[in-house]
Curated annotation (Swiss-Prot):
It comes from Neurospora crassa (strain ATCC 24698 / 74-OR23-1A / CBS 708.71 / DSM 1257 / FGSC 987). This is Probable kinetochore protein spc24. Pfam families: Spc24. One of its GO terms (biological process) is sister chromatid biorientation. The gene is kpr-3. The keyword Manganese does not apply.
Amino acid sequence: MLLEEDPSTLIAHTTQNFNITPDRHAVSRVAESLSTLQQARDLRLRESETNLKKLARTLNTLQSQHQEVTSSHSSAEHASLISRLDTQKFRVAKNVSDLEMETERLQTQLAELQARLQELELQGVDGGDASAAGGATSTGENNGNGSAGNGGQVRSVEDEVLLRLKVYRSLGIEIEREEQDGGEFTRAVVRNDRRGDVCVVNVDRHRFSRFFYANYFWQTL
């Protein structure tokens, strides 16, 4: 039996029957896996720390910039600036409107002065007196001609008026006559088909000359 055998012999046989090589290989593989995992973990940890430091620096930079912007541009100053700029904008717009109105007034005055200048140039230095004298002379000479000559002159005047009215209509100007003014032409309707405008002008010979109205009609057309 077992007790009768030599213990050393039993131990030797037991040792020979044990096969621990596969276990040792398994333990080695587990140790290598643990080492690889530890290295990978350390690498990811270092990368995470590096990214965290970068994000921290970016955050500090953005916070500094935000503080600078906030300190240099307060909401009260911004509102005050906007209000001041709005006031300046309205003031400039009003000045522009006033200047446009003044320009229109000066243009009208310039047209009146130009018309007056043309009238004076056409009349000449003694034009008014000469025309008056000529009119008086022709009146004296025509007093003895008789009713036949007067009738021919009336027809000639009517033909001239009709011709003028026809010319005006061809230009887009309608001349109207009012009965309460003694049958004189006192109103002109100027139509500009190109712009689609209609302008009504009250003709007052005592206020403006015919040259002024002629220039005004041309400018309107």
